[in-house]
Amino acid sequence: MIVSFIDLSNNFSVAVIDNFYSVFELGEIQNELKLLNVVAELKIFVNTEPAKDEQGNLKQKSNSFFLDNLYTNKRNLSKILNINRKLFNNEELRTKLIEKNLFYNHIFNANFDKTLLNFYAKDDYYKPHKDATCFTALTFFSLEEFCGGNLIFPEHNVEIVAKENRVVIFPGFVLHGSEEVTKGIRVSMAQFINYYTET
């Protein structure tokens, strides 16, 4: 695991973690993604909350759905939903993030998260938007060798290459998007991290 940071301002940064999952974990995730790609193509489950522009047009062109909805009350059946807990219980990562900025401690104190899978085929994209999250953690996977689909932060002129097993963590209020995929299938796993209070 290699952790680096890109400063967007004096107050916050983007964390980039390469080789986050082990070879074994990555294999388990890839196997499940191959099955879930069919679910995405059949649109059995779909993301009903993608970002829209002021005219109500979708900013997203890709197949996506919340994994939590597919495995409702059966999370133990999903390798992905179990393996991605690593984000919250990896002490080495926690130490490095908090050493950079105490604000990252929200990741480990938050009590609610959801996992969205985005399957980007050729010509798919996600125009710049903001998330209603405290933090968003994006992890990139490859179902087929892909080109394009880099993560962009247009207000800060930052572009991060989308590569297998790379995690990018950033505050949800930062404008971000995915460039068009020009070849293959690129998958992103978005973990939306928040606080939840029952009313």
Model features per residue range: what roles?
Residues 1-105:
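Non-heme Fe(II)/2-oxoglutarate
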Residues 90-199:
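Catalytic core of non-heme Fe(II) oxygenases with the double-stranded beta-helix
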